[in-house]
Amino acid sequence: MLFIIIQKAFGRYYNAPKTGIMSFMRQTLTTMLGKTVKKAAQIRGGSGSALPGLVIEKIDSDFVSRTLQQLPMGVALISGTNGKTTTTKIVVELLESQGLKVFTNRTGSNFTRGVAAALLGEVDLHGRIDADIAVLELDEAYAVHFVKAIKPNYCLLLNVMRDQLDRFGEIDNTAKLLHNVAINTTKCVVLNRDDPRLSSPDFVNDIESPLRSFGVNPKYLQTFPSDDSLHSNYQSMARLYADDTSLEEFKDQHAVIAFGGNDHPIDLNLRGIYNLQNATGAIALVRAILGNSLNVDSMLEALSNIKPAFGRGEQLIIDGQPCELVLVNPAGFRLALASFDPANYATMIAINDAYADGRDMSWLWDVDFDSLQEQGVTAVSGVRAYDMALRLEYDEVPIDFVDTDLAVALRQLITKHTRQPKRIYCSYTAMLALRRLLARYTDVEEIR
């Protein structure tokens, strides 16, 4: 009904030729309507990252492409199954360390409407944006629609994993979605050389833009498994490209990343070994964007100070003790369990099955939970709490409490372990709900 009212009231602007004064009026009107809806959504307690974008999609489908075309350095797109939000945050902060103004979809809302909503927070009332470049995290399927409207100048393709088979079908279909992004990229494609579905000749042969890659020293490939190494004997066909960026060594949060013919030691604030891989990919993309103008020292200093994206290893303080939120999916869960020592931590696991989480819970059986056997799990919650509890039972992990109600389970975790650090592994929608609940106990950064 809202869309019908808007079209009737302002139809002459949206049906007019897309040039000159009418185009300017359309941009201004769309911006004002979108900002109004965004503010109303926030007043009602939402993040303002979904409804405003949906309204924009319905009334003015060209708004995003028209706005992004203003940017002198164009668009860098980041996609893949795992690591998009954190890698995007790293790329943004590294580019900002070089003096650039960067637009990004900071909330991690990685559908096209999320980009539209994020733009509404950055443009002035006439739809003008003050930025040099856009760095956008996009879901694989929505990235395909995005590149039909506006071709990215650069793209970074992280990985292809099977945790979204209920959405995309066969894993090869996910690779095809990313291939479509790659062939529509105009200046440079950066890909994960250790993922055989992204580095195979079938994937790269018809990509016309220059190729760069990132990866890890071969001795660490088992630590960072691709989907094929987890589920088959398929061997990587990875090729080395001229401008490679490689994670050569790491221990805890210290890493040595090689590029430009030199090894660069770095200490990161980001916890989790998967973030070392994300950082390596981010550096590769920033190098592709800036070329010889890159100030390496400034970039590495910025990298050492980057903090986790919300819900991705984010650390809150409750009663003087840390409480970590760790977003999980199949590959992410495996690497998170390998990254974080459970000793002395009270652990909660919260799993939902909404569209953004993935509805097929069979992936839980791909994760090895043996590392939690000694410490056990304090609480299991979320829509799929009992599926998760059953999975833990098979790995002989002790569980204190199971309840599908996140508020009840969170209260159990906090009240039983007031003087102990806490860690919550959670799926995407569970993470969003838990951040709202945690605001009752401590300060939680509001995401707009």
Please place each PLM-identified region on the residue numbering:
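ATP-dependent carboxylate-amine ligase
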Residues: 11, 16-51, 183, 210, ...
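Buried hydrophobic packing segments
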Residues: 91, 95, 115-119, 279-289, ...
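Short, acidic/turn-prone active-site loops that include or flank metal/cofactor-
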Residues: 107-110, 159-163, 216-219, 351-354, ...
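Structural beta-sheet core signal
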Residues: 136, 155-157, 191, 213, ...
